[in-house]
Swiss-Prot record:
The gene is IMP3. Its cofactor is Mg(2+). It comes from Solanum lycopersicum (Tomato). This is Inositol monophosphatase 3. One of its GO terms (molecular function) is magnesium ion binding. It catalyses: a myo-inositol phosphate + H2O = myo-inositol + phosphate. Signal peptide: none annotated.
Length: 268
């Protein structure tokens, strides 16, 4: 067993942290925001920082020997190292641009890796009060009720989600729009909702059939959602079709029926 408790205890403490951080997000959602730029279109607010500080303090009090990786602390120091030690990977506010604009697709994402494997996942949208949870080998849940990926088996009837990203280099944008243009002829429709973690949870609960994203911020965007998708019966993998790498900033997710066709479509 991992240090300082069982996986169920880890989940309980992560849920506590996510819900309390959610209160901070909910309070800030309806107020004037003080926004900083991390890049041309990549934003950060005082709420991001306050939530990360709270979550890390909450987790460190309970699990002082564990390791911690967070979006805002990594942005400040510029690097991170994922080891075999139990490691909490946190995005305190996934969907910051949505938060700034008052678009209610925002969440806290908390993932725990043990021996580099995503093991516990918590994704909480405090604006609409949806809590997604998962433990490796023990199922996935939305507000305590079991969830499963969709049973859709036809790509042409599938709902796809992706994101445009924050890189505005012309070659990158052209590649992004070219890929989207190709996929639009193969699926029913496309959504860009602005949160990698919630897109993964959308696949997990069957609202979305397909999701992929390239060059997102880091492992904090996917560490929680990846567990939840897998425990809902889905597959998480690299868009090339190779094995998912938590640190590679590339992800795709779908159900068993669509996986092969989705990989083919992504690489045509």
């Amino acid at each position: 067993m991992a240090q300082n408790g069982s996986v169920e205890q880890f989940l309980d403490v992560a849920v506590e942290a996510a819900k309390k951080a959610g209160e901070i997000i909910r309070e800030g959602f309806y107020k004037t925001k003080h926004v900083e730029h991390k890049g041309m279109v990549d934003l950060v607010t005082e709420t991001d920082k306050a939530c990360e500080d709270f979550i890390f303090n909450h987790l460190k009090q309970r699990f002082p020997s564990h390791k911690f990786i967070g979006e805002e602390t990594t942005a400040a120091c510029g690097n991170f190292e994922l080891t075999d030690e139990p490691t909490w990977i946190v995005d305190p506010l996934d969907g910051t641009t949505n938060f700034v604009h008052g678009f209610p697709f925002v969440c806290v994402s908390i993932g725990l890796t043990i021996e580099k494997k995503p093991t516990v996942g918590v994704v909480y949208n405090p604006i609409i009060d949806e809590l997604f949870t998962g433990i490796d080998g023990k199922g996935a849940f939305l507000n305590g009720k079991p969830i499963k990926v969709s049973s859709q088996s036809e790509l042409v009837k599938a709902l796809l989600a992706t994101e445009a990203g924050t890189n505005r280099d012309k070659l990158v944008v052209d590649a992004t729009t070219g890929r989207i243009n190709s996929l639009l002829f193969k699926v029913r429709s496309l959504r860009m909702c602005g949160s990698c973690a919630l897109n993964l949870c959308g696949v997990a609960c069957g609202r979305l059939d397909l999701f992929y994203e390239l060059e997102f911020g880091g492992p904090w965007d996917v560490a929680g959602g990846a567990v939840i998708v897998k425990e809902a019966g889905g597959f998480v993998f690299d868009p090339s079709g190779s094995e998912f790498d938590l640190t590679a900033r590339r992800v795709a997710a779908t159900n068993a029926h669509l996986k092969d066709a989705f990989i083919k479509a992504l690489n045509e």
